[in-house]
Curated annotation (Swiss-Prot):
It comes from the Bacteria. GO terms for molecular function: structural constituent of ribosome. The keyword Ribosomal protein applies. This is Large ribosomal subunit protein uL30. InterPro entries: Ribo_uL30_ferredoxin-like_sf, Ribosomal_uL30_bac-type, Ribosomal_uL30_ferredoxin-like. NCBIfam families: rpmD_bact. The gene is rpmD. Part of the 50S ribosomal subunit. Belongs to the universal ribosomal protein uL30 family. HAMAP family: Ribosomal_uL30_B (MF_01371_B). GO terms for biological process: translation. Keywords: Ribonucleoprotein, Ribosomal protein. One of its GO terms (cellular component) is cytosolic large ribosomal subunit.
């Protein structure tokens, strides 16, 4: 089973409200903040909405 390491690399300033909500829901705050989330369809869907703001790596448990 793999997890996803998600890092916010661009600011959410001047972004759409929906994109800001997705960033907050994933647990990201400031630039360079990193979280580990499970690799599932819901997480992947959220990441697609903010793909231009983040970097994603797969990590093994």
């Amino acid at each position: 089973m793999t997890d996803l390491k998600i890092t916010l690399i661009r600011s959410v300033a001047h972004r759409l409200p929906e994109q800001r909500k997705v960033v907050k829901a994933l647990g990201l705050g400031k630039i360079n903040s990193t979280v580990v989330q499970p690799d599932n369809a819901a997480t992947r869907g959220a990441l697609m909405k903010i793909a231009h703001l983040i970097s994603v790596e797969e990590v093994n448990k």
